[in-house]
Amino acid sequence: MKERILQEIKTRVNRKSWELWFSSFDVKSIEGNKVVFSVGNLFIKEWLEKKYYSVLSKAVKVVLGNDATFEITYEAFEPHSSYSEPLVKKRAVLLTPLNPDYTFENFVVGPGNSFAYHAALEVAKHPGRYNPLFIYGGVGLGKTHLLQSIGNYVVQNEPDLRVMYITSEKFLNDLVDSMKEGKLNEFREKYRKKVDILLIDDVQFLIGKTGVQTELFHTFNELHDSGKQIVICSDREPQKLSEFQDRLVSRFQMGLVAKLEPPDEETRKSIARKMLEIEHGELPEEVLNFVAENVDDNLRRLRGAIIKLLVYKETTGKEVDLKEAILLLKDFIKSNRVKAMDPIDELIEIVAKVTGASREEILSNSRNVKALTARRIGMYVAKNYLKSSLRTIAEKFNRSHPVVVDSVKKVKDSLLKGNKQLKALIDEVIGEISRRALSG
């Protein structure tokens, strides 16, 4: 019966949602026509009740009949002390600076980061409720953004709470300095008594550093036992923190663990648009799409690519078209995605595809408009984009040197006069060259 119910639910949600929200989901008991489900924590319980109530209701009714009901329970962690009161508001103070650009409003949500985003937002709205929150993911996926978004949200909405954002390296350095200066008590007072929300970035930096791990362990316990919120970020999940004390890893896992996955192409496009909005810049849609399609390893590089294009546009006073973007961003594209290509032979094939003229017509002496236009476009792109020599172009297109020079000039003059149709064809040819060069 249990497996039938789970299978019925699974057929009603997509694979991504199942992996994201139902990973800790199970049937705890079936008593008559009532099903009791269990999940890993309160956050998931409330999310499923809010977003998937009808799905669960229909599933249990299909298996047990129309009178079937259900409830969701969660495994609550028992703290070391009996203290369970909400956070007591303290004097208004931000103990460490935060980047004002790192807000929930500026964070673009997609399938790969939805769970982490909503978990962080809930922690910001209800400090101490999901404790600790452990966010992990690869470089440049938004961990620091979410971590500081929590801090910025709390500062704006709960100004009496004391927020501290630190990197693990900063925590280590503070500890070392306090020991050298004989001020260990002041260190412990700072991190254990004078903070309501502790945000720790890059905890993997402490791998192999047993002494500071011990200090972090006791700091964690004291804050948690006092109902203070702890949020930790890492580039890997807790159980993969090698050379970390087991007791500390278990503390990281006892709350809410959320993974950040690389954004899909549509999310990257949305992120790129948001970055443009923040920078108050503009780029053509085809350029933005090119960046999102090809700079896909992390968001820092995506931002770097956009900044480079905007700086070029500002310093030169020129608009950035697709051709220019491809040239400017060659260092941002993964080298293993670039394949060798015969420049002009493949160019002729692409021109034929874009214009509708056959390869034979392009290389013939035909003077019909389609063939003539295609031929001139091919020579222009070969000269200005592929940077081929006039001699090579003449040989490949079966034309004399003067004819090539004249053809390139005619296209250039036509573009200067604002021939939008011709420009569109050339942009399409260049775009196809880049897609082929970057495929695989």
Swiss-Prot record:
CDD domains: AAA, Bac_DnaA_C. It comes from the Bacteria. GO terms for cellular component: cytoplasm; plasma membrane. GO terms for molecular function: ATP binding; ATP hydrolysis activity; DNA replication origin binding; lipid binding. Keywords: ATP-binding, Cytoplasm, DNA replication, DNA-binding, Lipid-binding, Nucleotide-binding. The keyword NADP does not apply. Residues 69-96 are annotated as: Domain II. It is found in: Cytoplasm. Residues 97-313 are annotated as: Domain III, AAA+ region. Residues 314-440 are annotated as: Domain IV, binds dsDNA. PROSITE patterns: DNAA. InterPro entries: AAA+_ATPase, Chromosome_initiator_DnaA, Chromosome_initiator_DnaA-like, Chromosome_initiator_DnaA_CS, DnaA_C, DnaA_dom, DnaA_N_dom, DnaA_N_sf. Residues 1-69 are annotated as: Domain I, interacts with DnaA modulators. ATP binds at residues 140, 142-144. Its main location: cytoplasm. Domain I is involved in oligomerization and binding regulators, domain II is flexibile and of varying length in different bacteria, domain III forms the AAA+ region, while domain IV binds dsDNA. Plays an essential role in the initiation and regulation of chromosomal replication. ATP-DnaA binds to the origin of replication (oriC) to initiate formation of the DNA replication initiation complex once per cell cycle. Binds the DnaA box (a 9 base pair repeat at the origin) and separates the double-stranded (ds)DNA. Forms a right-handed helical filament on oriC DNA; dsDNA binds to the exterior of the filament while single-stranded (ss)DNA is stabiized in the filament's interior. Oligomerizes as a right-handed, spiral filament on DNA at oriC. Belongs to the DnaA family. This is Chromosomal replication initiator protein DnaA. It comes from Thermotoga sp. (strain RQ2). The gene is dnaA.
